[in-house]
Amino acid sequence: RTGRCEASLSGHTDSVESVCWGGVGFIYSASRDRTIKVWGAEDDTDRGEGRTVGKLVRTLSGHGHRVNALALSCEYVCRTGPFEHSGAHFASAEEAQQAALVRYNKTGGGTEAEVERLVSGSDDFTLFLWSPTTQKQPISRMAGHQQLVNDIAFSPDGRFIASASFDKKVKLWDGRTGTFIATLTGHVSAVYKVAWSMDSRLLVSASKDSTIKLWDVSDPKTAKHTLPGHADEVYALDWSPNGAQVASGSKDRTIKIWRN
């Protein structure tokens, strides 16, 4: 609460484009120097792990151009809950707890899902999938976009990755292996942003073409809805915690709220 700087992390040789807190005591950074760096975010020296705040743990290399974006799979752990997309209410706390447990088990809870996975997107048109706390080599190199990658997002359940690109496309990938799943086409200009619904069923994308598109990942061939309304490029998107609404922000200086 003092506002003091706790640590200054130096090591990148060009500007830092993205930072991401991990869930197991690390912080990740992406840079124009084409690397991702893994830093200690907790002081574990008293436990004999040799990790201190700000200490460089490892450098992840492989991209051929600047790294624009990072996304971390462990985010879903904070969001797992008794969500019901139909809007139905649970009769009791016990029923809600059981629904949450079912959703958690579907993610592979208690097994490999506990290992953080990091995905990076670059100006070299590729994405890399990493296990950043355990190895320097990527799990997968994900190629397919024809222009630079603007944004990436893990689905809350960790099963999917969505990527947005200047090539006007959104692509879906397997969140554990990096295997390509589908290309979502429909935007007529660069796609800037993607965001998942809390139950991982739906995806929204925002574009330079001034529209937002809503996709159902079970049938991604065509957009479920196109949401016109902004008068200029759409830069920002987010779902409400209850999954019922989407907020968007545009170059037209407005924020719009859409109901699912």
Protein language model features and the residues they cover:
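WD40-repeat beta-propellers
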Residues: 1, 19, 36-41, 49, ...
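Short coil turn/linker residues within repeat-based beta-strand modules
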Residues: 2-4, 13, 43-45, 52-54, ...
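Structural hallmark of WD40 beta-propellers
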Residues: 5-7, 25-28, 57-58, 77-81, ...
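WD40/WD-repeat beta-propeller blade N-cap
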Residues: 10-16, 53, 60-67, 142-149, ...
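Loop/turn segments within WD40 beta-propeller blades
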Residues: 13, 19-25, 71-77, 106-115, ...
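A conserved positional marker within WD40/Gbeta-like beta-propeller blades
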Residues: 26, 35-37, 64, 126-128, ...
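Conserved strand-to-loop turn within each blade of WD40 beta-propeller repeats
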Residues: 29-33, 121-124, 156, 163-167, ...
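Structural signature of eukaryotic scaffold interfaces centered on beta-propeller domains
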Residues: 72-112
